[in-house]
Amino acid sequence: MEPCERPAPDFCAESEAYTLFRRGVDFLDEGHPAQAAMYLSRALRLEPGRNSIRETLGRAEFAAGRFERAADLFREVVADVPDCDYAHYALARSLKALGRGEEARGHLRLARALHPGCETYRQPLDGVD
């Protein structure tokens, strides 16, 4: 599950949190979401207010099949940044995986409204659309 547009990390490249974040992203990109989640969780403990870490950790948790944890993380991003289209989309996917299609529907609609040009968001989600 990739965002349509990847935002740049919002913290200092020299920090320990950034190093952990980059390692987590590398593990995620290499198809190792559980290892990615370990690094990203450590980064989030160091920088608890960073939505870029929270969103990437949500992606890792989703890829690892930990949908409840992923939904919690994406819900936190949505609460902090209500116009984050990707967080709404990822929350919809997580809720769908948990069998909560009705709850997912609103977040999918919001993602589509916030970023109507994203082909990924326009693809139907079974049981949600």
List each language-model region with its residue ranges.
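Long, contiguous interaction/recruitment modules in multidomain scaffold/adaptor proteins
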Residues: 1-15
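Alpha-helical segment of the N-proximal tetratricopeptide repeat
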Residues: 13-46
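TPR/TPR-like (Sel1-like) alpha-helical repeat modules
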Residues: 93-120, 126
